[in-house]
């Protein structure tokens, strides 16, 4: 019987490493024993955790700063212990958070054009963990809300605008937390921990909504992330040390929707998820490949697409947000693969013959504008990401400076009702420069359209005149 091949526009996703001159060379990537990605990327900068004497440090390079990186290049170096995790703010491309073995979280403001001097003073230091902080994750839709998780088995959610810890989940995990993931609107988090449990938690109600014991039975680390439809995707190991991936419905976590066994490598599988295309990319630490799968509503739900393979193993991996991709090249993902001494971008494309904008590859995607202010989220409001179109390419706007306003310690009013100054001016205040830039951009786009229309009309006219000339000549 002839087998029917499943139709998918992503069956031919093609991975390609960039040329050597477009890599970031001579970087001493961190050797610390921790299963984070060691790299964070946005449309302006790539940040990489590096080896540093006398404390912890990471590099922040403008994307165009390729080639050999000088040993004296400025670093972000305020931590007194190794940096374990970094995460760019989704609402401000110049703000990055870092977690360290020194038990602190620091939030940094990077100058618009990158560093010219090493940065030692963070905008704010967040102190609340009693052991090293291995996870930092910004809220996807609320401005200034940052989550951190430490080896004290506690999750703290901060209002960065005031430097306050407003939620402390310190009694939900009996063992080390491997990772934490926000859902699409930031109302829930899911966690994977060393006790082999996957938990879905409502952080504001401080209660566990769903829980699965022994999601994967192996002893090695697991990962759990939320998908756009609310399901949870996990990676882990079987009792026989085979790597597994699984899909779960939080409303019924007795049995997985899908469970696949992959291979017997021992590297932790780091999942990177694109909610616009429903593709999950799995990058194993120590692997030399990236496997990718499409998640659909039809059995077997998790469909293997392809594998990008290279020669060198990866020490870590950065993943570019959708708004940083080149839509003209039909690029659907860009990874920043960390080698021992360099960072190598890898571009994933869907080959298309047409030069037109591919609407089916690029639905409206999460933009840089926050949907909520911090105090709105802490008061119980939820909002989906504010979407933008990539049809004309994404042009980064000017970011506002991060400002932190400390509360008066003597002020004893409940924190939940207090108003606070935030990283950016509230939405109601219009950024004049930004509006002017948008108006100019609209004018330019209208002018281009007008020129295109004129050219089309001229082409038609020339064609008619040529036909008339041909008749006369005949």
Swiss-Prot record:
Ubiquitous. PROSITE patterns: WD_REPEATS_1, WD_REPEATS_2, WD_REPEATS_REGION. It is found in: Cell membrane; Cell projection, Lamellipodium; Cell projection, Ruffle membrane; Cytoplasm, Cytoskeleton. One of its GO terms (cellular component) is actin cytoskeleton. It comes from the Eukaryota. GO terms for molecular function: actin filament binding; small GTPase binding. Keywords: Acetylation, Actin-binding, Cell membrane, Cell projection, Coiled coil, Cytoplasm, Cytoskeleton, Endosome, Membrane, Repeat, Synapse, WD repeat. The keyword Coiled coil applies. Residues 436-474 form a coiled coil. GO terms for biological process: actin filament organization; activation of GTPase activity; corpus callosum development; endosomal transport; endosome fission; endosome membrane tubulation; establishment of protein localization; membrane fission. It is a peripheral membrane protein. InterPro entries: Coronin, DUF1899, WD40/YVTN_repeat-like_dom_sf, WD40_repeat_CS, WD40_repeat_dom_sf, WD40_rpt. Plays a role in directed cell migration by regulating the activation and subcellular location of RAC1. Increases the presence of activated RAC1 at the leading edge of migrating cells. Required for normal organization of the cytoskeleton, including the actin cytoskeleton, microtubules and the vimentin intermediate filaments. Plays a role in endoplasmic reticulum-associated endosome fission: localizes to endosome membrane tubules and promotes recruitment of TMCC1, leading to recruitment of the endoplasmic reticulum to endosome tubules for fission. Belongs to the WD repeat coronin family. This is Coronin-1C. It comes from Homo sapiens (Human). The gene is CORO1C.
């Amino acid at each position: 019987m002839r087998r029917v091949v499943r139709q998918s526009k992503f069956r031919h996703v093609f991975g390609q490493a960039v040329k050597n001159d477009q890599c970031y060379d001579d970087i001493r990537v961190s050797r610390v024993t921790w299963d984070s990605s060691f790299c964070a990327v946005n449309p302006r900068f790539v940040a990489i955790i590096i080896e540093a004497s006398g404390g912890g440090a990471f590099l922040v390079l403008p994307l165009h700063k390729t080639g050999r990186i000088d040993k004296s290049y400025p670093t972000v170096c305020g931590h007194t212990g190794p940096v374990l995790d970094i995460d760019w703010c989704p609402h401000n491309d110049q703000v990055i958070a870092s977690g360290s073995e020194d038990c602190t979280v620091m939030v940094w403001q990077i100058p618009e054009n990158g560093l010219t001097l090493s940065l030692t003073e963070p905008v704010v230091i967040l102190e609340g963990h009693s052991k090293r902080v291995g996870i930092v994750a910004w809220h996807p839709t609320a401005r200034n809300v940052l989550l951190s998780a430490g080896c004290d088995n506690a999750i703290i959610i901060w209002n960065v605008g005031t430097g306050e810890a407003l939620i402390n989940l310190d009694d939900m995990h009996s063992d080390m937390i491997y990772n934490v993931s926000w859902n699409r609107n930031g109302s829930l988090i899911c966690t994977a921990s060393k006790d082999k449990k996957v938990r879905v938690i409502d952080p504001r109600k401080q209660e566990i909504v769903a829980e699965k014991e022994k999601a994967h039975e192996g002893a090695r680390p697991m990962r759990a992330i939320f998908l756009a439809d609310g399901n949870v995707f996990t990676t882990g190991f079987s009792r026989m040390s085979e790597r597994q991936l699984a899909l779960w419905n939080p409303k019924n976590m007795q049995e997985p929707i899908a469970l696949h066994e992959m291979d017997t490598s021992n590297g932790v599988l780091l999942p990177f998820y694109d909610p616009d295309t429903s593709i999950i990319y799995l990058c194993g630490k120590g692997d030399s490949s990236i496997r990718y799968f499409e998640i659909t509503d039809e059995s077997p739900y998790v469909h293997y697409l392809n594998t990008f393979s290279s020669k060198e193993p990866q020490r870590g991996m950065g993943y570019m947000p959708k708004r940083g991709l080149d839509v003209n090249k039909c690029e659907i993902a860009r990874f920043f693969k960390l080698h021992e001494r360099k960072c190598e971008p890898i571009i994933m494309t869907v080959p298309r013959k047409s030069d037109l904008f591919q609407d089916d590859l690029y639905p409206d995607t999460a933009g840089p504008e926050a949907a909520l202010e911090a105090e709105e989220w802490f008061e119980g409001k939820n909002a989906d990401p504010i979407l933008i179109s990539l049809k004309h390419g994404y042009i980064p706007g000017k970011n506002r400076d991060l400002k932190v306003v400390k509360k008066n310690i003597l002020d004893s009013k409940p924190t939940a009702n207090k108003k606070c100054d935030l990283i950016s001016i509230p939405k109601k205040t219009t950024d004049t420069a930004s509006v002017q830039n948008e108006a100019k951009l609209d004018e330019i786009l209208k002018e281009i359209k007008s020129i295109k229309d004129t050219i089309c009309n001229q082409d038609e006219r020339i064609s008619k005149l040529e036909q008339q000339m041909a008749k006369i000549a005949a």
